[in-house]
Structures are given as structure tokens and as C-alpha cells.
């Protein structure tokens, strides 16, 4: 696919970065704000960043910089809600049904709401059946060792000195050969904010662009991983979406992974960055690259208007469960708009309560019903939303597993998830990975990758 104003060849094919010695495929000075492809610290054509804005991304709005969406009071800040344990698999191709052994958490209370109203077809005492139709067992218990809340594997370095780090990187790339270990040691132990400061310090000290220097010294997967780490988080999501729709074909699973898992504020920031950086409307690009009910679901996700209150209305959960049953299993055909409306607007704690009510009412879990009623990428998108309501770390753990399972490695997915979750919930993702697959994430990465690329991934993930 070709777009006006872009270089004739568009973005290069995967891994998505230009070979050493070639001009960057990111916007040039005459096209977009960033001549090197990455935003300078507070520079470029973006408007001045407000106090407290994203570092190195002048023009990205500060957290909370957007007005609260109409009709959904109580939206949280960009950190988003905590993970909600207890999910189902995603990595298999669309069409698979069942739970694939995802763990169930201990009981959680989300507060508020009247007692649940008995529903015809429910179970005595509100108990779930010991087995679902087809012999599927309920989720096993979540291990007591599971770290509560969310935690990244990368934390801001104490006694941080951007100029000292810039000097280390300069020495690592100076002369014959490259000291990749020095690069690994620096970038894997600095937060994204600190990396933006290093990038700015490098240009101030040496009058050179750090990203261009890194491109000239690195190649392949190592280059892609390093460049991803130096992109501001919002920009990386926007860039990944652009790449997923650039050229022939569309990488639908990338669209699902980003748009169906981010918080309202993150989505709004992505939409704004996409417009500023690429001069394009994200919603229009999605409409031109997708169709049908999948298109409608992604357009709904682009609005960033999900209710983010943590309280649960149990009466609403019962009513939504009935509506979903009547829109799917309880009728001939499927009312897709009903599924879209509920899954696109309800908070994740509310959806979790709805799934529990649905299981009691229908003697079938909602994920299985979605598999029976939908197919293709709209099925994957709807299931991703439900999986995040149940267990967000488990969703990403399975995505990582399938990126390395079998012949070959989907390095793009591996890099994207490790980088984007490294400061959010990679600790919990690692714990779920071990429980689900009886091996550690680092063990699987070590057996599926090699060289400095492996060293850097393992340094980010940890043991």
C-alpha cells in the first residue's frame, strides 16, 4: 500500500529498520518532526510539552491531559487497572475453543453492587459446575507465590548520569568493532525515560545522532531490539501500528495486541502521536485495512472510552450475561453488535464479573461461546479483551510462548512484548509463563535466540 508523502518504497520489510548505511525510513525533516525517526528531547515540530509530559516526546500529552470520556466517570490514570488473574489462551489460530488450562486466581472483591440475582439455568448456591461441557475442567488455582499488582523488570537506575552513559556508548562504537556488551549493560538497566535523556545528551556532546550511530554498528534482530528500546513508549506503539498496516497485507494480530490491551489514556496518546508523527488518522487507516465486525471492534477500541472504574455492578453483570447469551448461544445466528457494545465499553473488573455470571447461567464459559459464535480476527479480538479481563499477564505469556514455539521465531512479537511490558508487568508475565508452560521465559528465550540479541533479551527479562 502506498501513501502520499511517504518515500516511494515505504517502510522496509521486517524487521522494519533500514540496513546500515541507508537513510532512515522514518520521517525526514521535510516530512515529519523527527529527522532521525525518533523524537528529540522536547524538540521537533511538536508543540511544547506541558510540565510532566512524556520525556523526549515533546507534544505527547501529559498523563491526564485529555478530558474524561463522556459517560464513563472515574477513569484511571495512564497506569491503568491492575492485572486480573485467571485467563484463557490466545496463541493458537482463530477458531480454537476451550480454556487451554489457564490459571484461576483466588477470589477477589471489587466492591459495590447488590447481591447477584438468580438466573434461570443457574446452579444452586451460585456454584460453578465441576466440569464444563466436553470435559473441560475449571481453571487451576493461582500460585500463592504470584506477585500481587504489577511490576516491571526494568526500573530507573539510581545515580543516573546521562552524559556518562552517552560517553560509554560513544566509546563502545568508536574505532574498529563494537563493544556490544557495554551497550547491553547500559540500555538494559535504564528506564525508557532515561534512554531518551541519554539520546539527547549524546547529540549535545558529540553533535551526532545516537540512533544513526547505533544503526551503523548493529544489524538484524539486535538492531531492532536496541532501536525499540530507544523509542518513546507511545511512539513505539504508534510506529508498530503503522508498520502493521504499511505495504501489502495487514498484521491483524499486532492491531489486536495493542488496541485491545492498552488503557484509555495510552490509546488516546497513541492516536495523537500517530497523527502528529505520520500525518495520518489512525481510525481511517484501520477502516481502510480491515472490514466487517473486526473493523468495528478496532474502531471502538480506538476511541479510548472504556469504563475504567474498579467497582463492579453485579446486577449489570447478570443482565449483560443474559444479553450476551441471547445474542449468541440463545438464538439462531449472532447479534455481533451486542458483543461489541458490552466488550468495548465495560471495565475489565465488570467483564470478569459478567464472565462469572455467564458461566453460572449458561453452563458454558463465555470464551467458549465466543469461539462458537465468531471466527477469524474478530474472534481473536473479542477473546483478547476477555482474556485481559481475566488475566492480562497470562495473555502476554501465551503470546510470548507462541512467538517461539515450533520452527522459527516471531522476533517482531518477541521484541515488542518484552520491550513494551518491561516497565509494566513483565515480572507477572514471567511468573504466569512458568506456571503455564513448566519452563521459565528466560530458558525458552535462551534456547530460541543467540548472540548479543539473546544477551540483551535475557538482561531485560532477567532470570
UniProtKB/Swiss-Prot annotation:
UniProt free text on domains: A pair of annexin repeats may form one binding site for calcium and phospholipid.
InterPro entries: Annexin (IPR001464), Annexin_repeat (IPR018502), Annexin_repeat_CS (IPR018252), Annexin_sf (IPR037104)
Name of the protein in its database record: Annexin A7
GO biological process, alphabetically ordered: establishment of localization in cell; glial cell proliferation; hemostasis; insulin secretion; intracellular calcium ion homeostasis; intracellular water homeostasis; ligand-gated ion channel signaling pathway; phospholipase C-activating G protein-coupled acetylcholine receptor signaling pathway
Keyword set, alphabetical order: Acetylation, Annexin, Calcium, Calcium/phospholipid-binding, Repeat
Annexin repeats: 160-231, 232-303, 315-387, 391-462
UniProt function note: Calcium/phospholipid-binding protein which promotes membrane fusion and is involved in exocytosis.
A Pfam family assignment: Annexin
Ranges where the record places region 3 X 5 AA tandem repeats of G-Y-P-P-X: 5-20
Gene Ontology terms, MF aspect: calcium ion binding; calcium-dependent phospholipid binding; GTPase-dependent fusogenic activity
Quaternary structure, from the entry: Interacts with PDCD6.
Similarity section: Belongs to the annexin family.
Post-translational modification N6-acetyllysine, affected residues: 208
Gene Ontology CC terms, in alphabetical order: collagen-containing extracellular matrix; cytosol; nuclear envelope; nucleus; plasma membrane; synapse; vesicle
Ranges annotated as biased composition (Pro residues): 1-18
Amino acid at each position: 500500500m502506498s501513501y502520499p508523502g511517504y518515500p516511494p518504497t515505504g517502510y522496509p520489510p521486517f524487521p522494519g529498520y533500514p540496513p546500515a548505511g541507508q537513510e532512515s525510513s522514518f520521517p525526514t525533516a521535510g516530512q515529519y518532526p523527527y529527522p532521525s525517526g525518533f523524537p528529540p528531547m522536547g524538540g521537533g515540530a511538536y508543540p511544547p510539552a506541558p510540565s510532566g509530559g512524556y520525556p523526549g516526546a515533546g507534544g505527547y500529552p501529559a498523563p491526564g491531559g485529555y478530558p474524561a470520556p463522556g459517560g464513563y466517570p472515574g477513569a484511571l490514570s495512564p497506569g491503568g487497572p491492575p492485572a486480573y488473574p485467571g485467563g484463557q489462551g490466545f496463541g493458537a489460530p482463530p477458531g480454537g475453543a476451550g480454556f487451554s488450562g489457564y490459571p484461576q486466581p483466588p477470589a477477589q472483591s471489587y466492591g459495590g453492587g447488590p447481591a447477584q440475582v438468580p438466573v434461570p439455568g443457574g446452579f444452586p448456591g451460585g456454584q460453578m459446575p465441576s466440569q464444563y461441557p466436553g470435559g473441560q475442567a475449571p481453571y487451576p488455582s493461582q500460585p500463592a507465590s504470584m506477585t500481587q499488582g504489577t511490576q516491571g523488570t526494568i526500573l530507573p537506575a539510581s545515580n543516573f548520569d546521562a552524559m556518562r552513559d552517552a560517553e560509554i556508548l560513544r566509546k563502545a562504537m568508536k574505532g574498529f568493532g563494537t563493544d556490544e556488551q557495554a551497550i547491553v549493560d547500559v540500555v538494559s538497566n535504564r528506564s525508557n525515560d532515561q534512554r531518551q535523556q541519554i539520546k539527547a545528551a549524546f547529540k549535545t556532546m558529540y553533535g551526532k545522532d545516537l540512533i544513526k550511530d547505533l544503526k551503523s554498528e548493529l544489524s538484524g534482530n539486535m538492531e531492532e531490539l536496541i532501536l525499540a528500546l530507544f523509542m518513546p513508549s507511545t511512539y513505539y506503539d504508534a510506529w508498530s501500528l503503522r508498520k502493521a498496516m504499511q505495504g501489502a497485507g495487514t498484521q491483524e494480530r499486532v492491531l489486536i495486541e495493542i488496541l485491545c490491551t492498552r488503557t484509555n489514556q495510552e490509546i488516546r496518546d497513541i492516536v495523537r502521536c500517530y497523527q502528529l508523527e505520520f500525518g495520518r488518522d489512525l481510525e481511517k487507516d484501520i477502516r481502510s485495512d480491515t472490514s466487517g465486525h473486526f473493523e468495528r471492534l478496532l474502531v471502538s477500541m480506538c476511541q479510548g472510552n472504556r469504563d475504567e472504574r474498579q467497582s463492579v455492578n453485579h446486577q449489570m453483570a447478570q443482565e449483560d450475561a443474559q444479553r450476551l447469551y441471547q445474542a449468541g448461544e440463545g438464538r439462531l445466528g449472532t447479534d455481533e453488535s451486542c458483543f461489541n457494545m458490552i466488550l468495548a465499553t465495560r471495565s475489565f473488573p465488570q467483564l470478569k464479573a459478567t464472565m462469572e455470571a455467564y458461566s453460572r447461567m449458561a453452563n458454558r464459559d463465555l470464551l467458549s461461546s465466543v469461539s462458537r459464535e465468531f471466527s477469524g480476527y474478530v474472534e481473536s479480538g473479542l477473546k483478547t479483551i476477555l482474556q485481559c479481563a481475566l488475566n492480562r499477564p497470562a495473555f502476554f505469556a501465551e503470546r510470548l510462548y507462541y512467538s517461539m514455539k515450533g520452527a522459527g521465531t516471531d522476533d517482531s512479537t518477541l521484541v515488542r512484548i518484552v520491550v513494551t511490558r518491561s516497565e509494566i508487568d513483565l515480572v507477572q508475565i514471567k511468573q504466569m509463563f512458568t506456571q503455564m508452560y513448566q519452563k521459565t521465559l528466560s530458558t525458552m528465550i535462551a534456547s530460541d535466540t543467540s548472540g548479543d540479541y539473546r544477551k540483551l533479551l535475557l538482561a531485560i527479562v532477567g532470570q
